[in-house]
Amino acid sequence: MKIAAFDIGGTALKMGVVLPHGEIILTKSAEISGSDGDQILAEMKVFLAENTDVTGIAVSAPGYVNPKTGLITMGGAIRRFDNFNLKEWLEAETGLPVAIENDANCALLAEKWLGKGQDLDDFLCLTIGTGIGGGIFSNGELVRGGRFRAGEFGYMFSERPGAFRPGKYTLNETTTMLVLRRQYAELTGRPLEEITGEEIFANYDAHDAVSERLITEFYTGICTGLYNLIYLFDPTHIFIGGGITSRPTFIAELKHHMESFGLRDTIIETATHKNQAGLLGAVYHFLQEENRHE
């Protein structure tokens, strides 16, 4: 059996062919406009036409995803996917069985299948990028919620909200790499597109005052979110993914800031699979669905 896997991101569509034991034998990536759903569908069709020997399709998609029906009620930045049944569309196009799951849940499933969560019953995955997302594994089960919105950690308040625009005070608006870059651009008067997270952290290492202030606020925001999550779900482990985790000292710096919150007994580590987590988690979900229907 070969499974075609798709991981729909904000700037890229990752594609792969994966074997049932988790070996990725082919990968491909296409740059996309995160809001262009039709382009994403077209890229999927091209990849499937190039790989006609696959016997199933697994999809990791953003937004609120009903994995049973395949309906995406809200597709995040991809407005084309609002109230769109991607599972039915792919099945009609190919005649193949299709399984679809939320992208953050796929990252968690990859950790459960082939990562550090294999023997765990209570853990969280947190992804830090242009936004903050996550997945919840509690009492031995993936938690999706009544409307498939569980794990939207970025919508937690990071500070007391204002009356007129409460969303301004969420983690998504205060504690992401995009926000960090915007803040640095404002304080230095430089164009946002010139600034990278790597540059800000390099300046932090060089004891640049602006970078030190912003990075300290960044870590404090993450710790605030982790504090809330730990007391909500009591996980034994939290695994963090996203580009920030490529920084060798990230976990050590995060734990240093966590000390002031009095949290020491939850194990916090980087996630295992980096950019392949979405593909692997989607395939694991596909295999679970196939076994359930047998």
Curated annotation (Swiss-Prot):
Keywords of this entry: ATP-binding, Carbohydrate metabolism, Kinase, Nucleotide-binding, Transferase
Pfam families: ROK (PF00480)
Domain of life: Bacteria
Enzyme Commission number, as recorded: 2.7.1.85
Residues spanning the signal sequence: none
Residue positions binding ATP: 5-11
InterPro entries with a match to the protein in the record: ATPase_NBD, ROK
First-level EC class: transferase
Catalytic activity: D-cellobiose + ATP = 6-phospho-beta-D-glucosyl-(1->4)-D-glucose + ADP + H(+)
Molecular function, one GO term: ATP binding
Gene3D superfamilies reported for this sequence: 3.30.420.40
Family to which the UniProt record says this protein belongs: Belongs to the ROK (NagC/XylR) family.
Known function: Catalyzes the ATP-dependent phosphorylation of cellobiose to produce cellobiose-6'-P. May have a dual role of kinase and transcriptional regulator of the cellobiose-PTS operon.
Protein name in the entry: Beta-glucoside kinase
Naturally occurring in which organism (per UniProt): Listeria monocytogenes serovar 1/2a (strain ATCC BAA-679 / EGD-e)
Primary gene name: bglK
